[in-house]
């Protein structure tokens, strides 16, 4: 994931002090500062749905150890501490690539290591070699995939500040195939939602799970923008339809996919509140990828697939929103910056989500894909 500073003149003031940062992290915009009330040593983040409409505090206590991890990354992420942040005005300093920012810090507990060489064998770019025990010979070749940590049979390896004791063992914790199969078959596109915010804790759980989605070359350059509040979503929705109506009325609608739909969408919204794009969803998540990423188009789709499956497993409805994607890409690209997507990133896709107002009772039958079993002589 990439950190994105809030735009200059963001309409709130905080984070000038111990942290000195206002940032977006893992797709949820927030800044951390010491809580004025509450448990000693705790912090509260300020969630914002849009960098230009930050209102009110969203309360969530963060344990010291979690805060320390954020600070660990921040200290290594910027060439200079953000002394530029003053009185609520934030400039964007020169940034490092996040992969380069986190120290590799490869360590082996020799009392646990059995010198099996599994970590060396599985290292894609041969950054490790055996010298009685595994050693890191070229940090420049390490892509931070952490396979060495995952494959070690005795838990002797730690890397990037993470040890085996910090991880979840796979044995006994993988869902039964039948359960996964039911989840896949029971996944439905949801177009009817309750007018209710998804709880911040649950939303963060979904984002944390989706962060494990693979990216090409382990680039991890995705940028995730989340509209996590109904009021912000209503404002976003209204702005989209009013702009579409304006373009239709002035004859300025560009040639684009689903142009006929966009020509009428704004008028139908103004006439009777017909929400053909957003389906009255309370939230949306929009994923972009760095334009220089290895798999610029594929990575966002994989991320959203992870997000969707975890969401539906937790009772949250989702909808792949091609209409919003086409609208932002082809008709309203100027909205991207307001959604926290800079020119360095390419729009990947959009997904609506929220508590469903309709319940599906069973799986359905679907047509199988055309499969060809290939022999090669």
Give residue spans per PLM region.
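Short hydrophobic targeting helices and cationic amphipathic motifs
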Residues: 4-6, 26, 32, 47, ...
